Amino acid sequence: QAGTRKKQVGMFFWLWQGYHYAHGQMNDAYDATKILEKYGADVLFRQDSSVSPAGQFHFWGEPLFGYYRSSDTWVMRKHLQMLTDAGVDFLVFDATNAYTYSDRVKELISVWYEYLKDGVNVPKLAFYTNTSSGDTMRRIYDEIYNNAALKKQYPRLDELWFNWNGKPMIVGRSAEADDTVKSYFTIKESTWPNAG
């Protein structure tokens, strides 16, 4: 028997599409599956070429809605619909490389908030930090959670946060967090695949 504890389903969620070096024409997006099929593993993994430049963000394959930008609100709505229909409880935004994607998060909040006001049980939101975790958690706090303009625009904003032990959850390194961050969030310790 699994026990009586309520289980929740969370998903890692990326907001990089259209950011960093992946900002050209989306019909020229770097698709790892197509590169591998056409050029082989050496071009995809070992060579720096115009087909698969090192340091460029790659799609693993063509997404259901095409090579979209994370700022596309139509795609956000479709994602929200599918995630809600699937019963996903929360999303964890990838901020592991110290990019907060705050403008994209704010756009996503505007879509999520519409549905929240209409009574939809939307997936709640959280962040995962790793690189420069303390600084990144503080920027997320300042730019999103403690943003006076956002709170004024969205009076029920706090209802969008995924809470753990009575406070919004964030994944990070608690040893790097300042007192404000430690007080505001429940910090779940960041783990990394290659960490010793």
Would you name each region that the model predicts?
Residues 1-196:
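Glycan-processing catalytic domains of CAZymes
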